[in-house]
Each structure stands twice: as C-alpha cells, then as structure tokens.
Amino acid sequence: MFDKIEELERRYQELEALLSDPAVISNQPEFRKLSREHADLTGLVAAYRRYRRVLEEMEGNRELLADVDMKEMAEEELKVLEEEKERLEGEIQMLLLPRDPNDDKSVILEIRAGTGGDESALFAGDLFRMYSRFADVNRWKVETISASESERGGFKEIIASVEGEGVFAKLKYESGTHRVQRVPETEAQGRIHTSACTVAIMAEAEDVDIDINPTDLKIDVYRSSGAGGQHVNTTDSAVRITHLPTGTVVACQEERSQIKNRAKAMKVLKTRIMDSIQQEQNARMAADRKQQVGSGDRSERIRTYNFPQGRMTDHRIGLTLYRLDAIMAGDIAEIVDALRAHYQMEALKAQSEE
C-alpha cells in the first residue's frame, strides 16, 4: 500500500511543478485538468505526510521509555499517537479508494410518477421540492428542463438540471423507487394509500464525454402546450429530439426560444446516452464480481416515506428517521452522508477481498 502512496506523492510533487510552469498555465484546458488531479491527491498526500510524522514521533517516545523521569509522559504520548496512527490508516485507506470520475459533475434529475395516480404525481412534486431545497442549502442552481404537470398538482414527470460543485457525489444514491404512504386529501375514510415515484440521477454529459453524429438525430418543432393541453405559445418553440440509433427521445418546451429549448434537450439527450453506456458498463462489472456496490438500480425500491408515522426508512442501509417534515423540507444531509459512508465501506471491503 505504501509503495503506491509514495508513487502518488511523487506524482503530486510533479504536478506542483507543472502547475507553476508558464506553458501549462497558458493552456487552460490542460491547467484545469492538472489542477483537478492535484486537488484529488492533496488530501491523501497530507494524511500520509502526517502519518510519517506520527511514526517518527512514536519512535522518539519509545526511546524515552528507558528514561525513568520521562517514561510516564512518553507512555501517555504513545497512547495518543497510537490512536492517531489508527485513525490515519483508516483515512488513508478511504482516500486510496478509486474515485468516481463523475463525482464533481452537475446532474440531470428526473422524477416520474409511478403507481398511485394523482397521489403519485403530488409526491413527485414533493420530491422535487425536497431536492430543490437541498440544492439551495448547498448553493446549487436548479433549472427545470421539462415538466408534465398533473391537473391536480404535482408532476407526471419533471426533468431538471442541478448545477454546482460535487452534485453527483451527493445525489447519486438517490436513484431508485421512492415509496410514499399517506392519507390522500380526497380519502373520506382516512385510509392510507401507497404510491411511488422513480428518481434518476445522471451525471451531466460534457462535450468531451460523448460525441453525437448530427445525422443520427431527428429534430421536430411544435407549439408549446400547458397542463390542460392548451397551446401557450403561438410560435413553434418546443423541440423534440430523437436519437435514431438508440431510440432516445427528449422534448423541451420550457423556454420561449426554440434555440434555448434545443440546447436544453441536447444536454438531456447526451446525458441519457452517456448514462445508458455507464449503466451497461456497471452491469458488466457487477456480473464479473457477482455484486454491485451502490448500483443505483432504477428499479430498486430504496426508500419509504410514511406520513402518518412521520417516518423515513432507507431500505438499503436500514436507516430510519422520525423527522419526515424536516426531510421533505430538504434536510437530507444525514441520509446523504450515511449512504456515502456505507458505500465507501462496501467499496473498501470489496477492495480488500480482491
């Protein structure tokens, strides 16, 4: 393990020299790429350097054990240093885990009403508000790309971009089926209904990630329409793009400008195609190692929100919290952090077994 760390430390020193090179600084794409690599290694190198200092301090204190006057102080210091050594070893192991290259990216968020009719559409709206408020706390920007509103409120489907630093790292484990149990406002008997929505979190594709041949696209334009089907625009500003090789279809009508709608639709199209490729790769890797850590399987029921009990349960990690109002208001940091910690430990176990 330490041979690998020392190799990475040498690379870190090499990067520090490169980032002060005028030729690299003048090449902004290369400078940004090397800066990201440098930032990724900073935590590991700092932890390893502190670890080496702790080992040196422990050796110095062991030498003091032979001194009667210094023995008691040295023993106390060794105890503290041993605890720090163990903590640093765990931290270094975590920092050595392969980093998801998508973690720093913005995302495309898709929420679709599933079983449960109107109640499911209302819950889709609740989930969108929950993620929007969590985004506000993290100072991320949320922009609706397309929305199919339900006549009784909420959404049959809503697609939005969430832009900011480390969005995918925090939201990637939200993909899956979210189940809600509550009494609908129209339920006279007070019976609890169960409905569900699916959430998809996809790392936003960048131009360098995927190249789409324009001849593979079929682009249709039409008039925008509202929730009841009425036309709300007198020009053909809405855009529907079909990627012929995969059959992927994306429509956008949120903007008054056809150019802006086309740009938004292309962003979603590229992201979906890249996500599909990555899902296939993940499935192949999972088949190879017989398990998939943090798969984000879209068909998996990941969470239940029980309103009568004020309870949220995440079924993947057995986490239950009785503060549903706060969670629906966007206070999901505890859930996000617990999921990230769980899947880091799973990855660590898988790495130690290989």
Curated annotation (Swiss-Prot):
It is found in: Cytoplasm. GO terms for molecular function: translation release factor activity, codon specific. SMART domains: PCRF. Peptide chain release factor 1 directs the termination of translation in response to the peptide chain termination codons UAG and UAA. Keywords: Cytoplasm, Methylation, Protein biosynthesis. Methylated by PrmC. Methylation increases the termination efficiency of RF1. The modification N5-methylglutamine is found at Q230. Belongs to the prokaryotic/mitochondrial release factor family. SUPFAM superfamilies: Release factor. It comes from Pelobacter propionicus (strain DSM 2379 / NBRC 103807 / OttBd1). One of its GO terms (cellular component) is cytoplasm. This is Peptide chain release factor 1. The gene is prfA.
